[in-house]
Design a protein with these regions (language model features):
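Membrane-embedded alpha-helical bundles of polytopic integral membrane proteins
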Residues: 1-228
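Juxtamembrane interface at the ends
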Residues: 171-172, 176-177, 241-249
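Short, conserved aromatic-histidine micro-motifs
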Residues: 220-224, 259-260, 266, 285-286
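Interfacial loop-to-transmembrane junctions
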Residues: 246-269
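Juxtamembrane boundary at the C-terminal end of a transmembrane helix
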Residues: 278-286
């Protein structure tokens, strides 16, 4: 078992390093690689969600292909809209896809059509929309130029993941050392207040480094972003734990050796991304 634990640790480490390298590389390389990567991630995560609820939720049978296409298309549509390559007409096929999801249940004679609707729509709101909103972070309209020019700023979407990774790592280390008070025992027995606060401090600390190198936001705006990401990331993590608890599964999938599934890896970002978008819009209103 000692050997097994070690090989599992090595497997986890290799997967973790590759995962971070691919994510960081694709976000930084070009807006095109960013788009391709997250269309694939959206599709895989939604497919995994569909597989999970089909296997584990009573009488549920969602159309994995359609919800997967929906998530991928929503990402593309929001991207096209954000880079000014398309106007709002680009969302019409998506609306038709949602209508198809509703109407098809009339004819499919499945066991539990209402739950199929519910889980299908949830896949779009809970997974499709947050990933699509990454485009709002990544692309910026420059109204000052006479041509409508859109610039790609990889640092904002990347910073979300940096804050989440650092806060996770910090929470794990600090929680293991001094964690006494349980954060949310009913849903996630391992998390401690000490770990979560420690992880938050690590992430906010890193925001000062980002503020130094990328001064398009002030130090306090960066720190606020880190705080929002950490708090909502924790809720995102707990939300997915609640989902898995209700479905009686330990991991959402097996695609990542030693790391469970796609949902396990992106659970915290699914709430952190929309929260970050709202926070950054709020800064422009103040």
């Amino acid at each position: 078992s000692k050997y097994f634990r070690r090989s599992n640790f090595i497997k986890r480490a290799i997967t973790g390093v590759l995962f971070v390298a691919i994510l960081v590389g694709c976000i930084l390389y070009t807006s095109f690689s960013f788009g391709i990567l997250f269309i694939i991630i959206s599709a895989l995560t939604i497919y995994e969600f569909g597989q999970l609820v089909n296997m584990r939720a009573d009488g549920v049978n969602v159309n994995k292909t359609i919800i997967m296409l929906g998530g991928a298309y929503l990402f593309l549509a929001v991207m096209g809209f954000c880079i000014d390559a398309a106007d709002s007409k680009i969302f019409i096929p998506y609306v038709l896809l949602l209508l198809y999801l509703m109407i098809s249940e009339l004819y499919l004679k499945k066991e539990n059509p209402v739950l199929n609707w519910a889980y299908s729509m949830l896949s779009q709101l809970y997974i499709g929309l947050p990933f699509a909103l990454l485009n709002v972070l990544a692309f910026h309209n420059d109204p000052s130029s006479e041509y409508s020019s859109v610039s790609y700023n990889p640092i904002l979407p990347l910073s979300i993941f940096i804050f989440l990774w650092l806060s996770d790592t910090g929470a794990y280390c600090i929680g293991s050392l001094i964690g006494k008070h349980r954060l949310f025992e009913r849903i996630s027995p391992k998390k401690s207040w000490e770990g979560s606060i420690g992880g938050g401090i690590v992430a906010i600390g890193s925001s000062f480094i980002l503020a130094h190198y990328f001064p398009f936001m002030s130090m306090w705006q960066w720190a606020g972003l880190a705080l929002v990401v950490v708090v909502f990331g924790t809720w995102g993590d707990l939300t997915e734990s609640l989902l898995k608890r209700q479905l009686h599964v330990k991991d959402s999938g097996t695609i990542l050796p030693g790391h469970g599934g796609m949902l396990d890896r992106f659970d915290s970002s699914l709430m952190a991304i929309p929260a970050a978008v709202v926070y950054l819009y709020a800064l422009t209103w103040v």
